[in-house]
Amino acid sequence: LDDINTLAAEYESEGWETIVLHPGDVSTTVEENAGFRLVVPESELEVLDEAVNKDEESFSEFELHRAPAESLLMFVVTVKSNKHDQAIFFPTYYNPEVDKDFITAVQKQGAVFTKITNLDQSRQYSFCHSDPALFVP
């Protein structure tokens, strides 16, 4: 997570408002809108809600940074609103040996979705990443 904080600090130094999410759970999903499911603390979901509800469609760009790991593919995802100079950072990861259905699903779908939710899943936000090739080995 040092990388995520370094990336956020770089954006902040350029005048961006940043939100760093710290999921307690990250999992892959293969059903409709295949991608990642992140469970974050309620306090972080509140901050995300304030940012996204201003103009949800403006969070349309993303960057992906791979982090070195042995058997996992680890990423820092940055979802950006250039219109509002806001960036949301969160980690994701999966094991390509175990999550083969995930790889197949996102390749077939042509996108990767990230669903960010609270523990009881009563509130959720979803972002679409349009280039699944960036997420697969």
Label for each model-derived stretch:
Residues L1-E32:
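Long alpha-helical, hydrophobic tracts
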Residues V20-N82:
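Long, continuous compositionally biased terminal/linker segments
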Residues A8-A9, A34, A51, A67-A69, ...:
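A sequence-composition feature that detects small, non-aromatic residues
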Residues N82-P137:
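Glycine-rich, aromatic-bearing surface loops/beta-hairpins
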